[in-house]
């Protein structure tokens, strides 16, 4: 986190819009190492997600340490939905099923059926009952028979790879607990204002100061993990000749889905220059055949042609298992644009490939959209094309 502010700016007579908030934020955000230590000590923190995502803050603490007093604090002061973040492995251990067959939420939050401890609770809603349910679910030897559904605790299943794949509080809760060398589970609760509206950055900083809680960001957590971890690895590369000139073709192996993604690179990528970037997802065989396909904002041929005319550029092609029915559907609906809604998983994997290629500033060949937690990967979008 860069806390430096030019003294020349501070000495100007006219107030700078947003400067007070910037200074307050810089002083209020704790290093992620301090946030991890707070979690390790069983204390609660406020964790902020990206302003380009949900733009919210959650109370977060390690699930194994939760007490009735903690649940009561979240209920009284946080006011949001109290949830239990779990890894996919823990969800399988408890035999948790998805809340719905098709997740239609904007952020794809992975709710399971709500749960209750099978024994040791009364109505299930009291702070003591919910704390007991959580402790039951995260016990190292927890069994499916130890919980029942429905209940008053709402489990969320984190995606494999954590915040390097999905920049959400669900993944952040599990990641921070794991980094603190605790059970990889957390209790989280959104923070609302007194009037019931979502608390935003200024409100969240005031809230944390009032309750003496440390504040961290998911972007800093992403940055912390990405310093030593990556979910993609270069496995092959060579120079190829295309109809648009020579490109360096690089293959990346993704460890989560065991997919091989491709990158086409032209020229020298440097951190100080804003380079053309196209992230193409999902890559279909039809993208290489049908020049009239309008399911993407940029076709592969158009993107390659534009980059061929520039000094440098990158095309990242993210592959997914393309089943027979997918190909048939694509042929039948070729004239209809796709919804163009990237998943957060695609952002995370694509961002790690771009980071490996040395991209920092990019002129993104895509329709303008919010780009969650790109700062955590050290990436900056300077322009949409």
Predicted regions and their residues:
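Catalytic domains of riboflavin
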Residues: 1-385
